[in-house]
Amino acid sequence: MRVLETIATLREYRKSLKESVGFVPTMGALHRGHQSLIERSLKENSHTIVSVFVNPTQFGANEDFSAYPRPLEKDLALCEKLGVSAVFAPKIGEMYPYEIEQRLKLYAPTFLSHSLEGAARKGHFDGVVQVVLRLFHLTNPTRAYFGKKDVQQLLIVQHLVQDLLLDIEIVPCEIVRDSDHLALSSRNVYLNATERKQALAIPKALENIKQAIDKGEKACEKLKKLGLEILETLEVDYLEFCNHKLEPLKTIEPTNTLILVAARVGKTRLLDNLWV
């Protein structure tokens, strides 16, 4: 496995690859969710490149950029064990050679980025677009793999590829959950034992909503009330029912409904969602 730290070495390496290339962008602190993305890429491509880069432009002023876990050696060991072709692990100066005021301004599409996570984390998706587009240009992948847990990010990246006419297939991958049904996240390490138990209200709320839908309930307001009752011990940022353009729904639309939740457990903010 190659470990590439500079753009020059990545470009040289990429030129040597003549067959399909899968790309898995990450911020490190790899868990089984990331592993599932990597394994799918390995199955579907001749080569797989994983990036490990904690992107500063997607963190807000009061967010945990400096505290974000960076176990690089552990991440590299996992990638090598899985059979990854190369890991791109650049420094900030490699990815952002210019100071903020000198950079080209890139913005996420407003209709997908102004609500939900975009409302809670101003500028977050602009930062995501900044780094994803740079990584796509550098790796020039055949396919890129994104988890459905960060559904708003996934929709924005899909739109980015379509709008800028990029010849990249975006592959959405299912949410991976622990045995207690909590969605895997690098931020789960911040939870103590008590908070971990409290966090289980999130998947339980989604499961109960799904059961109600399966029994015939279609009114989003009633379903939301059901979910909020289960989430009452948490600080809920939102529980919303949207279509795939993130437009609010009043009734469930089969195959076109997303149920998205964000809630704080102690100081840790967790996301989850359900595709209906």
Curated annotation (Swiss-Prot):
It catalyses: (R)-pantoate + beta-alanine + ATP = (R)-pantothenate + AMP + diphosphate + H(+). GO terms for molecular function: ATP binding; pantoate-beta-alanine ligase activity. Its main location: cytoplasm. It holds the Pfam family Pantoate_ligase. (R)-pantoate binds at Q58, Q153. Gene3D superfamilies: HUPs (3.40.50.620), Pantoate-beta-alanine ligase, C-terminal domain (3.30.1300.10). One of its GO terms (cellular component) is cytosol. The active site is at H34. Its EC number is 6.3.2.1. CDD domains: PanC (cd00560). ATP binds at residues 27-34, 147-150, 176, 184-187. Pathway: Cofactor biosynthesis; (R)-pantothenate biosynthesis; (R)-pantothenate from (R)-pantoate and beta-alanine: step 1/1. InterPro entries: Cyt_trans-like, Pantoate_ligase, Pantoate_ligase_C, Rossmann-like_a/b/a_fold. It is found in: Cytoplasm. The reaction proceeds by a bi uni uni bi ping pong mechanism. Catalyzes the condensation of pantoate with beta-alanine in an ATP-dependent reaction via a pantoyl-adenylate intermediate. This is Pantothenate synthetase. It comes from Helicobacter pylori (strain G27). The gene is panC.
